[in-house]
Amino acid sequence: MGPYCAPHPLSLLVQAAALAAALAQGTLPAFLPCELQPRGKVNCNWLFLKSVPRFSAGAPRANVTSLSLISNRIHHLHDSDFVHLSNLRVLNLKWNCPPAGLSPMHFPCRMTIEPNTFLAVPTLEELNLSYNGITTVPALPSSLVSLSLSRTSILVLGPTHFTGLHALRFLYMDGNCYYKNPCQQAVEVAPGALLGLGNLTHLSLKYNNLTEVPRRLPPSLDTLLLSYNHIITLAPEDLANLTALRVLDVGGNCRRCDHARNPCRECPKNFPKLHPDTFSHLSRLEGLVLKDSSLYKLEKDWFRGLGRLQVLDLSENFLYDYITKTTIFRNLTQLRRLNLSFNYHKKVSFAHLQLAPSFGGLVSLEKLDMHGIFFRSLTNTTLRPLTQLPKLQSLSLQLNFINQAELSIFGAFPSLLFVDLSDNRISGAARPVAALGEVDSGVEVWRWPRGLAPGPLAAVSAKDFMPSCNLNFTLDLSRNNLVTIQQEMFTRLSRLQCLRLSHNSISQAVNGSQFVPLTRLRVLDLSYNKLDLYHGRSFTELPQLEALDLSYNSQPFSMQGVGHNLSFVAQLPSLRYLSLAHNGIHSRVSQKLSSASLRALDFSGNSLSQMWAEGDLYLCFFKGLRNLVQLDLSKNHLHTLLPRHLDNLPKSLRQLRLRDNNLAFFNWSSLTVLPQLEALDLAGNQLKALSNGSLPPGTRLQKLDVSSNSIGFVTPGFFVLANRLKELNLSANALKTVDPFWFGRLTETLKILDVSANPLHCACGAAFVDFLLEMQAAVPGLSRRVTCGSPGQLQGRSIFAQDLRLCLDETLSLDCFGFSLLMVALGLAVPMLHHLCGWDLWYCFHLCLAHLPRRRRQRGEDTLLYDAFVVFDKAQSAVADWVYNELRVQLEERRGRRALRLCLEERDWLPGKTLFENLWASVYSSRKTMFVLDHTDRVSGLLRASFLLAQQRLLEDRKDVVVLVILRPAAYRSRYVRLRQRLCRQSVLLWPHQPSGQGSFWANLGMALTRDNRHFYNRNFCRGPTTAE
């Protein structure tokens, strides 16, 4: 970013007036510099604002219901900041003034909130003050429903902080005292501080260094979050009156530090201590979190009376041995989710795991998480108690170092929908290996990898092309050590519908026999492997296969001289989605793909340019895909796209992606060969202009993306004939303007026009500004992301931040023209007159010059700005006080019409000028220079510089302008003062000690300042300075 030049104040005034007038007329976006979003939300995030913006009176401020000011630099909130937003309900002020520990540069910051800031908004329901350096709870309106004070500097909550907040239901105050926001103490919640909040249902006090449960909490609470404090004992009285509690989180209070991902305090020996009756009275409890609590065993009494418990989190404890023999699960018949992850023994990986029989009593269990327990073998005895659970749908076993797995055991689970065995060491049905897969958190629902996910242009109908696995039986074996696949692995898994095998090392040639048992398989992910596609009957054993991901299997395609057979595609009758992306396919593949069912093909990341360069060999490569709707040809190194290439694409195409190629030219008229095309993506290419013709008439194109090219010119009327175009992306190009003639009547139907990140030329009166204002409902990010590229001082700024100094003023232009014409005439006349009558002019000039000094001198005397320039040492407070309260008052205020004009540094010096410029102007613009001295033995700084300038004036103008005022007799001992008193007594004045002599002093000082010093010199010694006549 270049240096910023501050505009002239007058320019800012004119600019502000012009913007205010424009806003009053309703032309500019109503909430500049912020952005108005649907449902009355105003977004002011990341604008580096230093104060709350004051929106124009012409803006529909009454319609604003939500204001977001996240990540600005607002350090002071005033009483009047939100008064004009009469219907504001949601206010977000996160990350404006973060505490030192949370600041990126660790700078301390404290936010100031005036008393009536929020009281002035009686409709406010949700307020977020998180990540701000506030030390106390501000005054809040009674309408507040949700309040967030997390990651602030509030360390004390007292009874008066929430007075009158009877409607408050949600209170968040997390992270006010922890390792990232240190405070060296515990947050203090006074007993009964929250008791007055009769409707409070959700209270979160995580990461606050608490050592006990706050006393006398509101009985209305149904959610209490106290995790990651230091509460190591729990007794019934801690939760005595919380009978309505539904969710309780007390995890992380006595941590297991060998698995901690952040600074951790070791749990004391024999802790935590939980009283047997701690939870017995919480009959409505549905969720209990005891994770990361250093538990070695579970007491049956802890769960007595918890008949409604549905979610139990016991992860990150030491319960490995206990889960093989516990009996506590027999009575938890309503439990739906159980988390036992990372209950491993330190530095131990067990050969087998056998769950306790009591797991069979979890008849309502739907999800069981057991990743990170570290056992090497998964057999039919491992999960036997779970096989009869009628509702179990999800089972997570990832990251367990399993190298032997009998996958057939999952066929015995009647309702199982998802099994996650990713990040293990499975290499086959019964052959262990020693390698360890990468650690991954796992996923609950299978999703396509990022490389396969359809982009924005495919989002409309993506559901038609990519079947979802959310409600189907899914097995995830990704990130294991599989090298080959045998059909024995999938015995009894005929119900399986989704299989994920990505990120393995499968390098075998699939021949149609590997997946024989999986007769119902619909989705197969084999990405990031090394598959050899040599056989023509690959995957033909899967008659119901709808989606096949073969992306990132590039190694076989990079082998020189090895052929690849893609004819299997024609033999998959149900295949709808196929990905061959990022395989580097360039030669020795089937000459043509054929399929009557395929609707979406991802062929990105290959080398189609090399294939089409081989004459007509691969010209019809895609033509056999008769019902193809979506085709992705991104990153195929295409430099040209000839009409015959488009002509041999399927006529059924609706979406075509050509992103990130090297296309510098596109024949727009050739779009007629794709009559069904609705979306075309040409982003990230090298197009310089949209100039060769226009979009053809009759095209069904609805979306066109040409962003991230180098387009600097568009032919007028280019988009006119595409009357169905709804979305147009021209962002990140080289456009200097946006011309309404490009679109014609299309502007009436265009829903999205993205022109952000273009170097627009913000000249005054630019036509594109008016056009974009007319289209502002269709232009995303108009007020923030549509910026200027020129002139230089506006680069990167909003198009509405124009500097009006750049505007063309016709009157000023005529004046400048007249002045330049006069200068030209003078430039011609002066040499001519010098040539014709130079001697006469020279004589007249010098004759006039002889009279100028006296007149100039007299004129200068009359036009001096000040009678005296007062110089004194500001560091001496007594002297400064005398000058301001005695000298100034006597000479300027009490002399009536004879008042003198004094020049004082603090008052009369011009800001912006250098010290020497102000000093020189003060000495030469004053009749006298008066030095007010308290001592004369050490004179330096401003006094010395002023004295030297006065002496310089004596030498240049032969004027003695020095007047000395001595406040103490001790200063009278100076040799210079004594000499000057003998030569020019009236210019040296002593402040009298007796009040009776002060009247005479002021009279003598007035005479010394109004008369020339020449009249004061002692004629016995000298005549004083004289001026040449």
From Swiss-Prot:
A lipid is attached at C257, C264 (S-palmitoyl cysteine). GO terms for molecular function: pattern recognition receptor activity; protein homodimerization activity; siRNA binding; unmethylated CpG binding. Glycans are attached at N63, N128, N199, N209, N241, N331, N339, N380, N472, N511, N565, N667, N692, N729. DNA binds at residues 46-50, 71-76, 94-108, 131, 151, 178-180, 207, 261. It is a single-pass type I membrane protein. GO terms for cellular component: early phagosome; endolysosome; endoplasmic reticulum; endoplasmic reticulum membrane; endosome; lysosome; plasma membrane. InterPro entries: Leu-rich_rpt, Leu-rich_rpt_typical-subtyp, LRR_12, LRR_dom_sf, TIR_dom, Toll_tir_struct_dom_sf. Keywords: Cytoplasmic vesicle, Disulfide bond, Endoplasmic reticulum, Endosome, Glycoprotein, Immunity, Inflammatory response, Innate immunity, Leucine-rich repeat, Lipoprotein, Lysosome, Membrane, Palmitate, Receptor, Repeat, Signal, Transmembrane, Transmembrane helix. It comes from the Eukaryota. One of its GO terms (biological process) is toll-like receptor signaling pathway. It is found in: Endoplasmic reticulum membrane; Endosome; Lysosome; Cytoplasmic vesicle, Phagosome. It holds the Pfam family LRR_6. Its main location: endoplasmic reticulum. Residues 864-1009 form the TIR domain. Activated by proteolytic cleavage of the flexible loop between repeats LRR14 and LRR15 within the ectodomain. Cleavage requires UNC93B1. Proteolytically processed by first removing the majority of the ectodomain by either asparagine endopeptidase (AEP) or a cathepsin followed by a trimming event that is solely cathepsin mediated and required for optimal receptor signaling. Palmitoylated by ZDHHC3 in the Golgi regulates TLR9 trafficking from the Golgi to endosomes. Depalmitoylation by PPT1 controls the release of TLR9 from UNC93B1 in endosomes. LRR repeats lie at residues 61-84, 86-109, 121-146, 149-165, 166-189, 197-220, 222-241, 242-267, 282-305, 307-331, 332-355, 362-385, 389-412, 414-439, 469-492, 494-517, 518-541, 543-570, 572-596, 598-620, 625-648, 650-673, 674-697, 699-721, 722-745, 747-770. Gene3D superfamilies: Ribonuclease Inhibitor, Toll/interleukin-1 receptor homology (TIR) domain. Monomer and homodimer. Exists as a monomer in the absence of unmethylated cytidine-phosphate-guanosine (CpG) ligand. Proteolytic processing of an insertion loop (Z-loop) is required for homodimerization upon binding to the unmethylated CpG ligand leading to its activation. Interacts with MYD88 via their respective TIR domains. Interacts with BTK. Interacts (via transmembrane domain) with UNC93B1. Interacts with CD300LH; the interaction may promote full activation of TLR9-triggered innate responses. This is Toll-like receptor 9.
